[in-house]
Amino acid sequence: MSIEKQVAEQLLEIKAVFLKPNEPFTWASGIKSPIYCDNRLTLGFPKVRQFIAKSLAEKIKQTFGEIDVVAGTATAGIPHAAWVSDLLDLPMVYVRSKAKEHGKGNQIEGPISKGQKVVVIEDLISTGGSSLKAVEALEEAGAEVVGIAAIFTYGLAKGKQLLEESGTKLVTLTNYDELIEVALNENYVTGEDMETLKEWKKNPEKWGK
């Protein structure tokens, strides 16, 4: 079984992903969605989080080669970045969404030097906006961000466009299309639900309105 399918299966099993085609969730952005993904739940399942960390570490080595620093996005990316940096035996930093308003006023916590090659670790990619803020902060600090590694992506057109425009490479362990296929095969959803789930992906902003 592929990594994509294994991770999708695990996320469904521990209920980190909820699929409710008939009772949609409302995201903070206002988008109505038949799916809600909360990868923070992986923290409570040692075997799942270990598999995720190992898979991210392998994917980073295969895709980006030698890097100098692993950066986690605050807050959900931090634990995964810590485990991955341990496996790769590399320094780690984390990046806030904005600079602190007290103390040193840091946006990046941990040492970063000019020219260091960095991979940003994120738990989830929707539009990619928060990840790109982290990339921007690291580049302003002089780092060379070689890409983003995430557990899951919705694969939304808006997110793909933003990442392409910024020239940032994204690798993920699994994605929306793989996940809904696994959900159908494992009887989490019906064939009718699948049609709804596919429709949402085509136009999330207008779906359910």
Swiss-Prot record:
Stored Gene3D superfamilies: 3.40.50.2020
Cofactors, names only: Mg(2+)
Chain residues that bind 5-phospho-alpha-D-ribose 1-diphosphate: R96, K100, H102, E122, D123, L124, I125, S126, T127, G128, G129, S130
Keywords in alphabetical order: Glycosyltransferase, Magnesium, Pyrimidine biosynthesis, Transferase
EC number, as in UniProt: 2.4.2.10
PROSITE patterns assigned: PUR_PYR_PR_TRANSFER
One GO MF term attached to the UniProt entry: magnesium ion binding
Main EC class the enzyme belongs to: transferase
Chain sites annotated for binding orotate: S126
GO biological process: 'de novo' UMP biosynthetic process; pyrimidine nucleobase biosynthetic process; UMP biosynthetic process
Pathway recorded for this protein: Pyrimidine metabolism; UMP biosynthesis via de novo pathway; UMP from orotate: step 1/2
Catalytic activity field: orotidine 5'-phosphate + diphosphate = orotate + 5-phospho-alpha-D-ribose 1-diphosphate
Pfam families documented for this protein: Pribosyltran
Role played: Catalyzes the transfer of a ribosyl phosphate group from 5-phosphoribose 1-diphosphate to orotate, leading to the formation of orotidine monophosphate (OMP).
HAMAP family for this protein: PyrE
Quaternary structure annotation from Swiss-Prot or TrEMBL: Homodimer.
NCBIfam families, alphabetized: pyrE (TIGR00336)
Family classification: Belongs to the purine/pyrimidine phosphoribosyltransferase family. PyrE subfamily.
Stated name of the protein: Orotate phosphoribosyltransferase
Natural source organism: Listeria monocytogenes serovar 1/2a (strain ATCC BAA-679 / EGD-e)
Gene for this chain: pyrE
